[in-house]
């Protein structure tokens, strides 16, 4: 929320997120292709977030770790997208040097239950404790927004703000 305020006043540039499939991420020419795009468009990677789904960690954690480190060394930021939809493991989060954890909308849908609130709050706290910013997906109303703000979410996405553009 502070980020949005700073962006409004022109102090920082908006982030551009790019979703990458597991297949693309694990391909051998993935990093080379990104370097070419950066060069071609004279793009500075610090404002680009590469979003990978947690599934990539199931293929080979060491390869995923290496590719994430290479992306970050180039200046990109990296997010684990849809956290909690697959075989989430908190253990791999501490092994991966990512900038953001994007928590899946199913956790927002459970905010009407006490257990759901506790789980979401704990995931946010764990993410912060390992140095990750948290993006909550699927916020659709004011009460959900207020809860995730109280829980400490750094960023939110959802239909409450805008329907997706095609």
For each feature predicted by the language model, list its residue ranges.
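Short catalytic/binding micro-motifs of nucleotide second-messenger systems
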Residues: 2-9, 38
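EAL-family c-di-GMP phosphodiesterase catalytic domain
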Residues: 4-7, 21-28, 47-62, 74-166
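Catalytic core regions of nucleotide second-messenger enzymes
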Residues: 7-14, 42
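Catalytic-site microenvironment of enzymes
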Residues: 35
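Conserved functional hotspot residues or short segments at active or partner-binding sites
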Residues: 67
């Amino acid at each position: 929320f502070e980020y949005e305020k700073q962006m409004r006043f022109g102090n920082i540039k908006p982030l551009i997120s790019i979703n990458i499939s597991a297949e693309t991420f694990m391909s051998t020419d993935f990093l080379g292709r990104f370097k070419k795009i950066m060069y071609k468009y004279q793009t500075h990677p610090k404002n680009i977030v590469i979003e990978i789904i947690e599934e990539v960690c199931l293929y080979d954690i060491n390869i995923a770790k290496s590719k994430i480190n290479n992306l970050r060394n180039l200046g990109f930021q990296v997010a684990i997208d849809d956290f909690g939809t697959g075989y989430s493991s908190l253990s791999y989060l501490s092994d991966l040097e990512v900038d953001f954890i994007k928590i899946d909308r199913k956790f927002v849908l459970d905010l009407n239950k006490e257990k759901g609130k506790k789980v979401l709050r704990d995931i946010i706290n764990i993410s912060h404790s390992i140095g990750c910013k948290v993006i909550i997906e699927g916020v659709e109303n004011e009460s959900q927004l207020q809860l995730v703000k109280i829980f400490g979410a750094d960023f939110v996405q959802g239909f409450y703000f805008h329907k997706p553009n095609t």
